[in-house]
Amino acid sequence: MLFRSQEYERSWDNLTKPYPGIPEMLEACLAHGLKLAVFSNKPHPFTQACVERFFPAVPFSHVVGQGDRFPKKPDPSGAIWIASQITSQSHRIAYVGDTNTDMKTATGANLFAIGVAWGFRDIPEIREAGAQEICHTADQLKNLLVSRRA
């Protein structure tokens, strides 16, 4: 197992890339004045490395991975903290994710839960876990996020 971990650490970004349309969606959200953050169950240093590698020009307000600061998702503590740093109106924050854990985190934090269909879990599982909307493309997600800002 140690070998696999070391090998992955050396080559994790060789075949990894953002899903289609994600960089453009992030740019469009920023152009509309949306604030963006990252909250992951992956270790904090790895989360930071992923963001720096794939989204170096995106000014995320917060990038938070797993560490000693917050319990792992679906505990909503980390999401609540990030939301509180962005606005006092947490109900206006959308939490986007591709797993039931993400949806449980969003609902536990009283955030608007958006599931995406291109990730690791199927749509019924995401919906059952609390997704209020399901997006099938990055463009659909962008349109939903921008419309919620109004």
Where are these regions (language model features)?
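Substrate-recognition "cap/lid" segment bordering the active-site pocket of phosphatases
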Residues: N14-K17, P43-V96, N100-A109, I123-R127
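Short, acidic loop-to-helix structural element flanking the phosphoryl-transfer center
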Residues: R10-V38, H44-A49, P76
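Nucleotide-sugar donor-binding loop of glycosyltransferases
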Residues: A117
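Short, small-residue-biased leader/transition segments that mark boundaries at the very start
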Residues: M1-L2
